[in-house]
Design a protein with these regions (language model features):
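C-terminal, non-catalytic macromolecule-binding modules
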Residues: 43-99
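Hydrophobic alpha-helical scaffolding
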Residues: 28, 40, 55-60, 100-104, ...
Length: 174
């Protein structure tokens, strides 16, 4: 069982901060043997700019820097020391889960066309839900597994090319 994060508080500090990577492919500056989890509000993937937050009892929560929950303007003064520098390790795992939201003009075979794009881009789909609004739009939420932000950008671009799709976004700060 891994321990929660423990800050190095020795009297003498090395000139270079300690860099320890986690099993999730995250390097946490100044912390060793640290539990790392990805924030569900913004679901970061390799290539995203990220920041860490030392939680109470759950290790370091990794957020995208553009996540509203990680916005420096919204940070509480008493939590200042709990925001830490984190980065992606060069050797990351195969798939990272994130969410895409698609808004499209509803039409026959829309889901099939979206599924075709996901298959063609070799994108893992772990969950997909869709609903139609009263004004004829389709709102589709897709949980996908991607290797990095480059693959995610490709998937987004290809989905935006599907007939009737108005926008494809990545939610942040749920």
């Amino acid at each position: 069982q891994r321990q929660m994060c423990i800050r190095d508080r020795g009297k003498t500090r090395p000139a270079v901060p300690k860099r320890t990577k986690s099993e999730q492919g995250i390097v946490v500056e100044g912390l060793s043997n640290c539990l790392v989890k990805f924030a569900k509000c913004c679901t970061p993937v390799p290539g995203d700019d990220i920041v860490g937050f030392i939680t109470r009892g759950y290790g370091v929560s990794v957020h995208r820097t553009d996540c509203p929950n990680a916005d420096p303007a919204r940070r509480k003064p008493e939590e200042k020391g709990r925001w830490i520098k984190v980065s992606w390790d060069d050797s990351t795992r195969e798939n990272y889960s994130t969410t895409l939201e698609v808004v499209a003009k509803d039409r026959l075979n829309l889901i099939m066309d979206i599924s075709t794009v996901l298959s063609a881009t070799k994108t893992w789909v772990t969950n997909m839900s869709a609903r139609t609004t009263n004004d004829g739009f389709a709102l589709i939420t897709i949980e996908v597994g991607v290797s990095d932000s480059t693959q995610l950008s490709t998937v987004r671009r290809r989905l935006e090319q599907v007939s009737g799709v108005l926008r494809v976004t990545r939610p942040a700060g749920r």
